[in-house]
Amino acid sequence: MVKIAYIINGLWNPAGMERVFTVRANFLCKYFDITFITRGQGHRPDYFPLEKRIHRIDIDDKIPYFNGLEKCLLENQYDITVSTGGEDFFFLYKIKDNSKKIFEFHFSYDISNVWMRSIMNPIKRKIWAEVQKFRRIYFASHYDQVIVLTKTDWKKWRKWISKVLYIYNPSTIICHETSICEVKSAIAVGRLSYEKGFDYLIDVWERVHQKFPDWQLDIFGEGALRSELQAKIQEKGLANIINIKGVTNDIVKEYQKHSIYLMSSRSEGFPLVLIEASSCGLPIVSFDCPSGPSEIVEHGGNGFLVSPVGNIDAMANRVMQLIADKSLRQKMGRRSLELSQRFKLENIASEWIELYNQLVSS
């Protein structure tokens, strides 16, 4: 059986990348011998459950990472090793263990523009964003295969690297009962960080609340900006209207209890939450940020795409259009469910099976 190792910072975090890799591995372990290699996770348990046949190795973070990972790969002789973009990305390809090396990039091609936001001088910020981007391209060029999450990003990457493919993330949930889109509540899910744009969403809902004061907004997630966002909600007098709920263990139930899904991100790789919301029959209003929403949301079909990112009034108007028209919400919700079938796990998994088998035989 072909042996595959996924190298990831840790599996203790309840985030999108960890969820995606866990779901993928749990499906593919029927066809491949799979190991997750983490670093410094220690006694923290994996957040998402893994099938028993999947192996786990945690490298002590007190030893040099290169040495620990090299020893692990040479001892286990994997056929394929996968970097998910952690520190190992910069040296994994140098380890001579005879495995095929894959680099998966789960962010937008232009994410460096967001990551460099702390540089106040716009010219310096642009320069350093370009430096980081081309540094990433340089290291990625040493891998046997590069995988990105959207067709949009694939077109950008292939200008520099020929061995790049795009494979969508699959739906990671099963929803047996979809939303009826009648509850006066909208939902947003994600890490409470700058790139997710929840500061925008609070401004959007301030406008919505002026016309529809009986509607609520629930935000599910945790992160560094929680106190800052909570303060903004308080400042606008929306403490009883916008609720930051934290992390939930049953996100499907929450989707079912809401009527509209909202996404205010500045940048995304491939937003898993939009697939999840679609699978539960929710209409979507999202900023058309780089690079995933436009490949999930059919504008006017299962929701609305709003441009440019940060256009508060335009997004608020689209939300209010859905709030005012229940039949439109339900029609778009049904279309969401139809479109979500593209991202069923078994369909996406077949692409991974084909890729892994091709790499091993080449």
At which residue positions do the language-model features occur?
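N-terminal strand-loop element at the rim of the active site
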Residues: 6-23, 27-64
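A conserved mid-protein helix/loop that constitutes part of the nucleotide-sugar donor-binding site
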Residues: 15-23, 184, 188-210, 224-230
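Membrane-proximal helix-turn-helix segments that form the acceptor-binding/catalytic region
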Residues: 70, 125-145
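Short His-centered aromatic/hydrophobic patch
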Residues: 83-88, 105-108
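Aromatic "clamp/platform" in nucleotide-sugar-dependent glycosyltransferases that forms part
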Residues: 247, 266
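Short hydrophobic beta-strand element within catalytic cores of glycosyltransferases
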Residues: 283-287
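A short, well-ordered alpha-helix in the C-terminal region of glycosyltransferases
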Residues: 314, 321, 328-342, 350-354
